[in-house]
């Protein structure tokens, strides 16, 4: 759905600036310069729809007030003035029409207007009518969804109607450091002390109900907070059971999430629970870039002038949203159309059923925006592009299909055959009944071809870029160990009941737990010596979280003629990783093995100076105790894990896989050197190493094997080590330190996102 309207402002802008504004409206609305209600929507439906909205004052309020500023008077860039990004603006209009659509996620690098579009959408949202005294923006027309206790507090006017008032549609942003109690709500200490009972204090979720809930950099949001947030949004209700509170309130805002994939991917599980996932990293023409810079400069110099230039487009979008919300109640989608969406999802390799559910809702919203009660072909195609395509697993089209010639045109028909065919068609049309006509109309509302072919490839190659963008930013499922929880160090994320002595007292949670009992405790204390009464049962401890770095342990074969090259490569790779690990808190350790045993040449460290000093001496030569080297790496990793500073551990083994020293000889050289001590066979040495590799997998560590064996005498045992440890394997016999560093960084990045 494009936005091709060229809008000539009715006010004069800077003489040197010629701007072309792209309308927010779909093509059926953009056939004329401005939205014409009576020409686009059926007249018999327009008047009652407007009247239905104006009864609560929303339409009148929208025309009288300008809602382009935040609560603090800050002017946000208008959405109608954003150049390009048509698909994202369409998605935002869909979300404004139906906040229950499932949320919108926008990915993009820096400077792609992600946040600008999210904030600019707030200006086109119509105001809402809420019940007076409601803490969660209760809808007077849906009393079954009111929060607990509102029935007792509600007030009535002289006519017996519930008292209401009009407010701006809420726009709530969740900060990255938000705590759980601020998000879902907690105890109101002041009111609890006054009343002597537990009083609920609403959180951000209550404030965002029926509005917009915006999360910037959702990929950096705490994992527990993001899971809690999406669970509440999926259920549509926030149930708080904590600190003596039992409270529930509705929570159905429109979720808008933005993130930069370069700063970390979003878990696939989270993206799957958001309906529309789009990328702002789309190619932009030179002319559009010039226009974007021009309008941004004009907004900085004179924002009021820009608002005036797009004022009419913004008002039209508000009216369109109000009307579309009413049409949405009557929009229907047929069973055949649902089958089409399911087939597209199956061909695209989409997992689960969320894609079809979201796509059906998006198609209905598109029809409502067009002022229709039925879903058409274009609605289905657009729904597939917005919802199913970003979730798809694209397969490459076979070469023989890519260069296939187009099918030959049908043979020409003579005039007599045409006349006979026309007569037969007329007879068939007369014999068709009403049911046949409905079936024919239904068939016309299905696309003639699928977006995905039977093999899962894209029929339209123009859509390949969008699918690739979606797959590039897609994260992996799983629970990350990039955060360490403790009770003594880190950032305070939530209170908890102490398990033993309290190391860090959560003063806020302790006061909240004690607040409801202050009145009773004062009455018991006749001497009245204290102002606040806190008992041991009120104590709450802080749960802290801190960023956990990864530990990379280089296990280097320092035996043989190529030992010096391996050690130099490991040294260079370690120094490169340390130079880049300041923000990620990664540590590096080097364990060379030679002679009869392995030694920790560089203990886990983030210091480049220490690494340079320790690595000045590079011991080489002797036997190859590979099993002892891997065992030492496991011991170092476990000790580092106990320190509480390491979340992920990766062992990088640079070896040819040839071992000639047993683990018994490495642990007890004197006993192994005795004349009567049996010498281990080659198979026994391999079994030892395989056993250690299995232990690496069981401890949760990751193994990367860089095979340096000559391919002419290769035994393939290094690859077997990686297979048993469920690790990665690279054959790099002549790799430099840069190549080793690159391979390690890629494996480490995959480990952190897993």
UniProtKB/Swiss-Prot annotation:
Coiled coil: none annotated. InterPro entries: AAA+_ATPase (IPR003593), BchD/ChlD_VWA (IPR041702), ChlI/MoxR_AAA_lid (IPR041628), Mg_chelatase_ATPase-dsu (IPR011776), Mg_chelatse_chII-like_cat_dom (IPR000523), P-loop_NTPase (IPR027417), VWF_A (IPR002035), vWFA_dom_sf (IPR036465). Residues 551-751 form the VWFA domain. Its main location: plastid. Keywords: ATP-binding, Chlorophyll biosynthesis, Chloroplast, Ligase, Nucleotide-binding, Photosynthesis, Plastid, Transit peptide. The magnesium chelatase complex is a heterotrimer consisting of subunits CHLI, CHLD and CHLH. This is Magnesium-chelatase subunit ChlD, chloroplastic. It comes from Pisum sativum (Garden pea). The gene is CHLD.
